[in-house]
Amino acid sequence: MFYDEAKIYVKGGDGGNGIVAFRREKYVPRGGPNGGDGGRGGSVILEADAGLRTLVDFRYRAHYRAERGQHGQGKNKHGRSAPDLILRVPVGVVVRDATSGQVLADLVEDGQRVVVAAGGRGGRGNARFVTSTDRAPTFAEKGEPGEERWLVLELKLLADVGLIGLPNAGKSTLLARISAARPKIADYPFTTLTPNLGVVRLEDGDSFVVADIPGLIAGAHQGAGLGLKFLRHIERTRVLVHVLDTSQPGEDVLAGWRTVNDELAHYNPELARRPQVVAANKMDIPGGEEKVAFLRERLGDSYRIFPISAATGEGVQELLYHVSGLLATLPPPAPVTAPEEEKVTALAPEELTIEREGQVFIVKNPDVERRVAMTYLDNEEAVRRLQVYLKQKGVDDALRRAGAATGAIIRIGKFEFEYVEEP
């Protein structure tokens, strides 16, 4: 079975916790704090692998979590950082954020990697909080939570040429004729249910990859037939070979040509402008010459028409050499990845906002959420330090302006607190 789409959940490993520890050795008075830092959590990384063809590995498992970092130890020993979790995907996978739809990466080269969920940094041990006024801090930090998100993986085959046309036009027969691929071939529509790839090698040494796409019908861009599911696989192709069945009446052949091109334009207008060559197939059946003359009269000089027979091989070599020459003049396809935005150093902190759901006030700010998540809430000194931070950050003032009163519930990230007004 061919699986070209998957939805998965990924989570980077949490950082290891820093610990509270003090040096205790004979003859070493006031040894001081020596709690070590936690290790960094592992990241989840997608890596393109040319040896894979589908996303079937993600069919039976949807959740992937990297390991957390090791906790710190006494004697200033830092915890071990966790290994990254590497998930291998086929070359040609587009990675999107499932919530926003934003393109995160387009993996078009073997070995190309992208971090999709970064691991959290390790929490600092109490030795890192020594100051001139606090020589023996009794608090440390928890590890930073790893990033988590849902992803949509979408495989778009990497091929130079796409064979398009109505069902039963002879696309699979042509692919079998020009390459070593052996797609299923039968005399009924929709024999091809999955895209097939074949490598064409010419006598002059040139070669290119051809994709046979399941037949398109009217309404394919809206989900009719199998078209919508597989139209994505011709988005990367540089040349389209439109296979027409000349055993049909001339007007039907022309109507089929228009139907397929209309579907391409509706799905992606750029596809309709892509270089397209017409392969008038089944010339071994009587009456084909009249159909070719009819097509040339109606299509004019806009499209190069090659009379061929995929069954006998007639005219196929001339078609292939023309396609090879056309490919030599075209640039490689651009990646789907959205252009990288210009990086600007932020001098001001990220905006702090308060959202209200009944008597629950939700504090929104990445820095604040991270600080709360990394605080030992059962440690009195750590909580006092957090309260000072929240006040300096303006959280108290923002809550008062939002109408928070004593007894209200304050939610910061995954934690909830009861609000108490200052006297």
From Swiss-Prot:
Biological processes, Gene Ontology terms: ribosome biogenesis
Cofactor: Mg(2+)
Domain OBG-type G: 159-328
Residues that coordinate or bind GTP: 165-172, 190-194, 212-215, 281-284, 309-311
InterPro entries tied to this protein: G_OBG (IPR031167), GTP-bd (IPR006073), GTP-bd_Obg/CgtA (IPR014100), GTP-bd_prot_GTP1/OBG_C_sf (IPR036346), GTP1_OBG_dom (IPR006169), GTP1_OBG_dom_sf (IPR036726), OBG_GTPase (IPR045086), OCT_dom (IPR015349)
Binding site for Mg(2+): S172, T192
Domain Obg: 1-158
Statement: the UniProt record of this protein carries the keyword Oxidoreductase: no
EC assignment: 3.6.5.-
Gene3D superfamilies for this protein: GTP-binding protein OBG, C-terminal domain (3.30.300.350), GTP1/OBG domain (2.70.210.12), P-loop containing nucleotide triphosphate hydrolases (3.40.50.300)
GO cellular component: cytoplasm
PANTHER family: DEVELOPMENTALLY REGULATED GTP-BINDING PROTEIN-RELATED, MITOCHONDRIAL RIBOSOME-ASSOCIATED GTPASE 2
Entry's family note: Belongs to the TRAFAC class OBG-HflX-like GTPase superfamily. OBG GTPase family.
Subunit structure: Monomer.
The name this protein goes by in its record: GTPase Obg
Organism in which the protein naturally occurs: Moorella thermoacetica (strain ATCC 39073 / JCM 9320)
The gene coding this protein: obg
